[in-house]
Swiss-Prot record:
GO terms for biological process: cilium movement; inner dynein arm assembly; motile cilium assembly; outer dynein arm assembly; positive regulation of motile cilium assembly; protein folding; protein localization to cilium. It is found in: Cytoplasm; Cytoplasm, Cytoskeleton, Microtubule organizing center, Centrosome, Centriolar satellite; Apical cell membrane; Dynein axonemal particle. Zn(2+) 1 binds at C394, C397, C414, C418. Belongs to the ZMYND10 family. Zn(2+) 2 binds at C405, C408, H426, C430. A zinc finger (MYND-type) spans 394-430. InterPro entries: UCP037948_Znf-MYND, ZMYND10, Znf_MYND. GO terms for molecular function: molecular adaptor activity; protein folding chaperone; zinc ion binding. Interacts (via C-terminus) with DNAAF11 (via CS domain); this interaction stabilizes DNAAF11 at the protein level. Interacts (via C-terminus) with DNAL1; this interaction stabilizes DNAL1 at the protein level. Interacts with DNAAF4, HSPA8, IQUB, RUVBL2 and DYNTL5. GO terms for cellular component: apical plasma membrane; centriolar satellite; cytoplasm; dynein axonemal particle. Plays a role in axonemal structure organization and motility. Involved in axonemal pre-assembly of inner and outer dynein arms (IDA and ODA, respectively) for proper axoneme building for cilia motility. May act by indirectly regulating transcription of dynein proteins. This is Zinc finger MYND domain-containing protein 10.
């Protein structure tokens, strides 16, 4: 990777070895923040490994040192923090921070972890190294898919909502809502990679996917709703690379990545030998699955030829009798991370929020500058540009951008007018980042 190497092999191994779980009340603390920065470095290095070089040491290190279960636990812990503690913080009348960057880092932590898992779960040995926590990860992905199915609208805020006057905490809540959509889409990809490993999953995991959550039927609903597609001004748009992009008329029939992930997951869940002997084809399941026939066009089959087997399966399904729900007595494992964390912290959400208000999120200007300096060192511009899938976009209007903020060098704009309009939102972070750079 030459000059684009972010971490030396020895340095990456030290960071991986140091990964560990934190209690909910510790989120945002100094030690937690350091691990978050380390995770971001591992994240960027993993993307570089996957796109620039042949070797993929981050994935290998995570497997070797048994850290995939740690990442899964951290993922579910921050998900719980966002559901149980973050809303309490937002309601506290005596908490009106002028700078929400420390809280943003906790909110963003879930996105960082799921992004890393999406990058490395492509490899079967990573899924296998998750051990029992793959059950917890399946449940996590199921929760995110439910959010996608229930989602209404186009998946982001309107321009009026995005730029209307709001307090820093209200602004952070909007950002968290927009982030949740992207997190859920990445969870879909992780779930698809788990289904690639049907032959090595435990019976408990197979039962969780096929019976408890009935993922095949849920995926059919996802295809019907297609929350990553919308019509805007009469034009078709797909959500890709973190934003809505207009699809050229000549590309309308082209399969997008997220639809592809759903189809591959369906193929694995319905046609793998492990699934075919365990999935109970009830009247409801049959009715849902036969809806897929309308989507299996010749154009789609040209792009994913293996779906011809799924088409044959559905043609056969239409002719056979359905099965009554199975009532077998099965002794199986159940996910334990969410339940354990909830038991440990039940009735303490208010206390955790107040503790974090006093000891974690009320930082001095000096502490904020130091944090901004570490942030600037973590997000190296040359690496970010190397892993970016396309040219940068304007932070205000999302048009293609060619000019950076001259002060912090981290935010892009298409013109001076957009920069002026965005300054009210960007100003405080910009000043802190610039001060951090000068303090190096």
């Amino acid at each position: 990777m030459g000059d684009l190497e972010l971490l030396l092999p020895g340095e990456a191994e030290v960071l991986v070895q140091g990964l560990h779980s934190f209690q909910l009340r510790e989120m945002g603390s100094e030690g937690w923040s350091k691990q978050h920065e380390n995770l971001e470095k591992l994240n960027m290095q993993a993307i570089l490994d996957a796109t620039v070089s042949q070797a993929e040491p981050i994935q290998e290190l995570l497997v070797t040192h048994g850290k995939i279960p740690t990442l899964v636990e951290e993922l579910i812990a921050v998900e719980m923090w966002k559901q149980k503690v973050f809303p309490v913080l937002c309601r506290l009348e005596d908490f009106k921070p002028q700078n929400t960057f420390p809280i943003y880092m906790v909110v963003h932590h879930e996105a960082s972890i799921i992004n890393l898992l999406e990058t490395v779960f492509f490899h079967k040995e990573v899924c296998e190294s998750a051990d029992d926590t793959v059950l917890d990860l399946v449940d996590y992905c199921h929760r995110k898919l439910i959010l996608l199915v229930a989602r209404k609208g186009g998946g982001d805020l309107s321009e009026e909502e995005r730029f209307q006057d709001s307090t820093p905490m209200q602004e952070l809540q909007k950002q968290a809502e927009m982030m949740e959509f992207e997190i859920s889409l990445k969870a879909l990809s992780v779930l698809r990679y788990i289904t690639d490993c049907m032959d090595s999953l435990s019976l408990s995991t197979l039962n969780r996917m096929l019976t408890t959550h009935n993922l095949p039927c849920l995926l059919v609903e996802l295809l019907e709703h297609s929350p990553w597609s919308r019509r805007e001004g009469g034009k078709l748009q797909h959500f890709e690379s973190g934003r809505w992009q207009t699809v050229a008329p000549s590309e309308h029939q082209k399969l997008n990545k997220l639809d592809g992930q759903v189809w591959i997951a369906l193929y694995n869940l319905l046609l793998s030998p492990e699934a075919r002997t365990r999935y109970c084809l009830t009247n409801f399941a049959k009715g849902q699955l036969l809806k897929l026939q309308a989507f299996l066009t010749d154009t789609l089959l040209d792009q994913l030829p293996n779906l011809a087997d799924l088409k044959s399966f559905l043609a056969h399904l239409a002719l056979v009798e359905t099965q009554p729900p199975k009532k077998d007595l099965v002794l199986e494992q159940i996910p334990e991370i969410w339940d354990r964390l909830e038991r440990e912290n039940k009735g303490k959400w208010q206390a955790i929020a107040k503790h974090q208000l006093q000891h974690v999120f009320s930082l001095s200007e000096k502490d904020l500058r130091q944090q901004a300096q570490r942030w600037a060192e973590t997000y190296r511009l040359d690496v970010l540009e190397a892993v970016a899938p396309e040219r940068p976009r304007c932070a205000y209007c999302s048009a293609e951008a060619s000019k950076r903020c001259s002060r912090c060098q981290k935010v892009w704009y298409c013109c001076r007018e957009c920069q002026v309009k965005h300054w009210e939102k960007h100003g405080k972070t910009c000043v802190l980042a610039a001060q951090g750079d000068r303090a190096k």
